[in-house]
Amino acid sequence: MHENFDKRLEVLLEGLALTRRSLDPEGKENELKELEQQAVQDGFWDDVARAGKISERIARLKQQLSEFNELKNKVSTIQFFLEDEESSKDLEMQKELEKEFVFCEKKITEWETLRLLSGELDRNSCFLSINAGAGGTESCDWVEMVLRMYMRWASSHSWRVEVIDRLDGEVAGIKHITLKLVGEYAYGYAKAESGVHRLVRISPFDSNAKRHTSFASVEVFPEIDDKIEVEIHPGDIRIDTYRSSGAGGQHVNVTDSAVRITHFPTGIVVSCQNERSQIQNREACMNMLRARIYQKLLQERLEKQNIDRKNKKEISWGSQIRNYVFQPYTLVKDVRTGYEVGNIQAMMDGELLDAFIKAYLVDYGEIT
């Protein structure tokens, strides 16, 4: 047992050193001090949007530094007790050391994943849309299951989740939903989820208990700021207003506050019914439209790179990316990377999603 702990400690120390180099805690402490000084200056909240971003950055820096210091202290504690011959032989102490090892190894893996996120927009927040495929109620129920998985996963990363637009199924589930994941590296992680997710199970809506196949498509696009120029001509769009709807199409707002914008050159359609006023929903729609158009430009650039790349893997946008099999056996398998797990319940609880994303980033991170 002691020899096994020694080997694991070597790996932890190496991982901690790599984490320190990539995180640059000293640099982040200096950045934190500068931002905190700005936050106490008079007139800081005159520009609410800018102040909000700075406040979020301060909170994120504090969280990163706190997590790194906790990791560093735990590794030091493990090292101290392993060097103490008497303590390392104690069975209760070995149990405690195992818990500390598991925590540190998990945290090191998270930092390793962050090192793979080097894209120009990877640190941004993002929009994530889920749409039901053919299959009626069964597919709508699958969308709701996928939504639950992403909600739990986002919570584990301490990202804020906003529901931008939602259309419930006629019997059960959800036909379409758009979320905004607000937090650092939300896009870097979530971009791996774009594509079609396939479900195989015995349908609870089928009295004959037959096995059904359902599909849900996921689309992820980054939030972009005003520094990125996306040209949208007024004549290229149509703006429609309608009443916000709840489950079963029931109106939840007596005014036409919901907004839908259609962009003719690309065929992109975005909608928002989350905000209280039509003006706010229109602004949110325009932000989404800018992001969608920019994402389309990125995809076109990526497709050109794929043509020029002969010996590297290609990405097929909108293709099936993952299978979720509930019956006759349990298996989740990513068709792009080959990564798979048998614990489908943990997957649907959002607990194993990061492992799939890391496998994707290892294979595709350099070209996304």
UniProtKB/Swiss-Prot annotation:
GO terms for cellular component: cytoplasm. The modification N5-methylglutamine is found at residue 250. Pfam families: PCRF, RF-1. The keyword Cytoplasm applies. Transmembrane segments: none annotated. The keyword Protein biosynthesis applies. Keywords: Cytoplasm, Methylation, Protein biosynthesis. It is found in: Cytoplasm. Methylated by PrmC. Methylation increases the termination efficiency of RF2. GO terms for molecular function: translation release factor activity, codon specific. NCBIfam families: prfB. Belongs to the prokaryotic/mitochondrial release factor family. Peptide chain release factor 2 directs the termination of translation in response to the peptide chain termination codons UGA and UAA. This is Peptide chain release factor 2. It comes from Chlamydia trachomatis serovar L2 (strain ATCC VR-902B / DSM 19102 / 434/Bu).
